[in-house]
């Protein structure tokens, strides 16, 4: 679970990086689709799945808006993200294992884009936060 220090660290880091969330989302989703090609099955309805394409950029931004929303609901992610959990479980039918894959790619992009701010302590807190976010999104799968 997230400690008070983790929550403070996540909020502080997010305030530094959120202005670049479109770029973060685009790069993280682009990487996921290339490095983990099995994830493309969820996006087969898109005309183009290449890194940086319009649909990838758009969904990357959507994902990062969700991350930003989760930061604002960090005190109760499960209740705060119930609608998103239902969407992913019942409508989109996304395998929850993919939340871990995307979280990993988001962390990679943080490290690349913010090498001075993404310290080991920030890395730990963001990793714990993204894992908690994934668990909250998986809530309706039970």
UniProtKB/Swiss-Prot annotation:
One Pfam family of this chain: Globin
SUPFAM superfamilies with a match to the protein in the record: Globin-like (SSF46458)
Residues the record lists as binding O2: 59
GO cellular component assignments: blood microparticle; haptoglobin-hemoglobin complex; hemoglobin complex
GO terms assigned for molecular function: haptoglobin binding; heme binding; metal ion binding; organic acid binding; oxygen binding; oxygen carrier activity; peroxidase activity
Presence of keyword Cell inner membrane: no
Keywords for this protein: Acetylation, Heme, Iron, Metal-binding, Oxygen transport, Transport
InterPro entries: Globin, Globin-like_sf, Globin/Proto, Hemoglobin_a-typ, Hemoglobin_oxygen_transport
Entries under CDD domains matching the protein: Hb-alpha-like (cd08927)
Stretches assigned to coiled coil: none
Domain of life: Eukaryota
Ranges for domain Globin: 1-142
Binding site for heme b: 88
GO biological process: hydrogen peroxide catabolic process
Known tissue expression: Red blood cells.
Residues bearing PTM N-acetylserine: 1
Note: This fish has two hemoglobins: Hb1 (major) and Hb2 (about 15-20% of the total). They display the Root effect and the alkaline Bohr effect, which is enhanced by organophosphate and to a lesser extent by chloride.
Known partners and oligomeric status: Hb 2 is a heterotetramer of two alpha-2 and two beta-2 chains.
Function: Involved in oxygen transport from gills to the various peripheral tissues.
Family: Belongs to the globin family.
Name of the protein in its database record: Hemoglobin subunit alpha-2
